């Protein structure tokens, strides 16, 4: 299997009143079927990088695992598109209907699944982190400058975790949920505590993205785009600071503004 996140392909382009042949970068879509204790759990459409992190983060987001010690083994067979996961426990009855679900790269889950499972295991943030406006603007600038494949293709979501100064991890994926799951998996693998960390994200803060941030455990989420009304409601309920429209030296704070302090004070 070719593990390139993007590939050059021939296209016909129209520009300045003319049609001409050229090449363009396409992002790669890769179906990964996750097998848990020998049973098919889900198929995720993703970018073919950091797949072990993706699998671990995805299982944690689904509530199938709570910590690294519950994993017995994770074997990635990227030539066939399978991830074989062994757990030190049974999944239980609540995951029976999850079998053979397809998680598309561009779409969230159904509203029913989201409310029954996702919201139930989201954590209320106890984060005590504070940030200055300059830190917020600098982190978003750094995320965008690090996203060279997005600049080439326009087709990937980017996300990072930071303490306000240092990026601990930066990941990209064709699916916005996958990008966050890769961060989550990275932190679980390395036992990184994220309570006083920041999630920086390139996409819109939807309710599902906000729930994902709550599962990861961060207290602040930053985005260059706007949140939805339900995302802001959830952010207030879960004690998460949501900051959006970070661009041109400004931003909007939608929930829990007490974590953002004036650098002039």
Curated annotation (Swiss-Prot):
Any idea what job this protein has?
Answer: Required for formate dehydrogenase (FDH) activity. Acts as a sulfur carrier protein that transfers sulfur from IscS to the molybdenum cofactor prior to its insertion into FDH.
Cross-referenced InterPro entries, in alphabetical order? Cytidine_deaminase-like (IPR016193), FdhD (IPR003786)
Gene Ontology MF terms in the entry: sulfur carrier activity; sulfurtransferase activity
The record's principal subcellular location, in a coarse class, is: cytoplasm
Task: Kindly list the places in or outside the cell where this protein is found, as annotated in its UniProt entry.
Answer: Cytoplasm
Give the family from UniProt. Answer: Belongs to the FdhD family.
Keyword terms, alphabetized: Cytoplasm, Molybdenum cofactor biosynthesis
Q: What is this protein called?
A: Sulfur carrier protein FdhD
For the keyword Metal-binding, the answer is no
């Amino acid at each position: 299997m070719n593990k390139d996140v993007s590939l050059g392909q021939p296209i016909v382009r129209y520009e300045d009143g003319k049609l001409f042949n050229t090449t363009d970068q396409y992002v790669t879509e890769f179906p990964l079927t996750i097998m848990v204790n020998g049973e098919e759990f889900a198929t995720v459409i993703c970018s073919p990088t950091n797949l072990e992190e993706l699998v671990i983060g995805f299982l944690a987001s689904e509530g199938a695992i709570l910590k690294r010690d519950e994993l017995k083994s994770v074997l990635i067979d990227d030539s066939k598109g399978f991830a074989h996961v062994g757990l030190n426990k049974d999944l239980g009855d609540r995951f029976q209907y999850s079998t053979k679900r397809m998680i598309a790269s561009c779409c969230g889950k159904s509203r029913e699944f989201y409310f029954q499972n996702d919201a139930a295991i989201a954590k209320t943030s106890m984060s005590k982190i504070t940030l200055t406006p300059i830190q917020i603007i600098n982190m978003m600038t750094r995320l965008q400058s690090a996203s060279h494949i997005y600049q080439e293709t326009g087709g990937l979501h980017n996300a990072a975790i930071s303490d306000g100064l240092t990026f601990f991890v930066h990941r990209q994926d064709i699916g916005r949920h996958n990008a966050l799951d890769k961060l989550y998996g990275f932190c679980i693998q390395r036992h990184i505590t994220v309570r006083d960390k920041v999630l920086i994200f390139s996409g819109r803060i939807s309710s599902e993205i906000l729930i994902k941030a709550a599962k990861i455990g961060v207290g602040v989420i930053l985005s260059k785009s706007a949140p939805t009304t339900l995302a802001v409601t959830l952010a207030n309920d879960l004690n998460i600071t949501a900051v959006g429209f970070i661009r041109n030296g400004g931003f909007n704070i939608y929930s829990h503004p007490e974590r953002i302090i004036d650098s002039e004070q």
